[in-house]
Amino acid sequence: MQNETDVIKNFDQELNIEWEDKVMEPRMYRVILHNDHYTTMDFVVQILMTIFHKPAAQATRIMLDVHRKGQGVCGVYTYDIASTKIAQVHFMARQNEYPLRCSMDEV
């Protein structure tokens, strides 16, 4: 009696299939907050602490980058996580009537 691995090998050989064992790392994306003239600094810090789980000091530093440089990097994530975090930022901003924008760009 053949074990499962042998059965799969024989099946693959009959169909002339070659398998490659290549594991690729997922693409990573930077999540970026953009400055505007209406969103308060306190709200940006709250977003960074709530959604991105940043400690207060780091959240404040990122908020100051957003304020002074026009944008700040919140973190680097896989596509699905980055998309979810962006949607959460936009939802929370909308709920609080702020025009805060967030985007991602591939690392």
Curated annotation (Swiss-Prot):
InterPro entries: ClpS, ClpS_core, Ribosomal_bL12_C/ClpS-like. One of its GO terms (biological process) is proteolysis. Signal peptide: none annotated. Transmembrane segments: none annotated. Binds to the N-terminal domain of the chaperone ClpA. Belongs to the ClpS family. Involved in the modulation of the specificity of the ClpAP-mediated ATP-dependent protein degradation. This is ATP-dependent Clp protease adapter protein ClpS. It comes from Syntrophus aciditrophicus (strain SB). The gene is clpS.
